[in-house]
């Protein structure tokens, strides 16, 4: 079974994390699939918006650390770097529909999304300090810009998680919804009706 599902519905591409047995821990192969899908969508005039979501209860438990230990993503052109480059430079509206745990990259990728819709019970976590890791995806720059230095420092230095209400208050997410994917689809459909730029 594919660990990244791709569905095109008219002008909307939905990319679904589909590794529920590992709470969608992201592997190098998954990163490369996501990077390739985003690159393709970026060059496809017919695609007007992209949604990233989950097929299960949790958005993602972050990077699959065992996979990363086998081949650390140190080089330019690695699957992780390809994904980060694609998500950072993506020129079309990128919407995330999330629920459950959004750990590590599950939170940091959201800084690169245009609209984020989260379930009320979503927990956001960037536990880099707990793992002895450096924050990824530009998060140590982007998170303080979003929430202010004091709030960002508290989260980064303690590794504490936060909920959807806090995420909404500080502007990390646009909306809390009991049905994040349905809400994200409505937003994507509205975007798709706008004139192309």
Q: Across the structure, where does each feature detected by a protein language model lie?
A:
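Short helix- or helix-capping micro-motifs
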Residues: 61-63, 143, 151-160
């Amino acid at each position: 079974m594919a660990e990244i599902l791709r569905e095109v519905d008219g002008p909307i591409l939905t990319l679904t994390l589909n590794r529920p047995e590992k709470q969608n821990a992201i592997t190098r192969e998954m990163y490369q699939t996501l990077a390739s899908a985003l690159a393709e969508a970026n060059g496809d005039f017919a695609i007007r918006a992209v949604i990233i979501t989950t097929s299960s209860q949790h958005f993602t438990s972050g990077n699959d650390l065992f996979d990363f230990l086998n081949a650390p993503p140190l080089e330019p052109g690695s699957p992780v770097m390809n994904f980060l480059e694609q998500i950072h430079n993506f020129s079309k509206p990128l919407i995330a529909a999330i629920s459950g745990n959004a750990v590590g990259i599950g939170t940091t990728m959201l800084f690169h999304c245009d609209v984020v819709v989260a379930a009320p019970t979503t927990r956001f976590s960037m536990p880099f300090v707990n793992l002895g890791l450096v924050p990824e995806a530009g998060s140590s720059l982007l998170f303080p810009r979003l929430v202010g230095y004091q709030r960002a420092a508290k989260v980064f230095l303690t590794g504490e998680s936060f909920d959807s209400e806090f995420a909404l208050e500080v502007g990390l997410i646009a909306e809390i919804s009991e049905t994040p994917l349905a809400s994200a689809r409505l937003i994507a459909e509205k975007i798709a009706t706008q004139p192309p730029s």
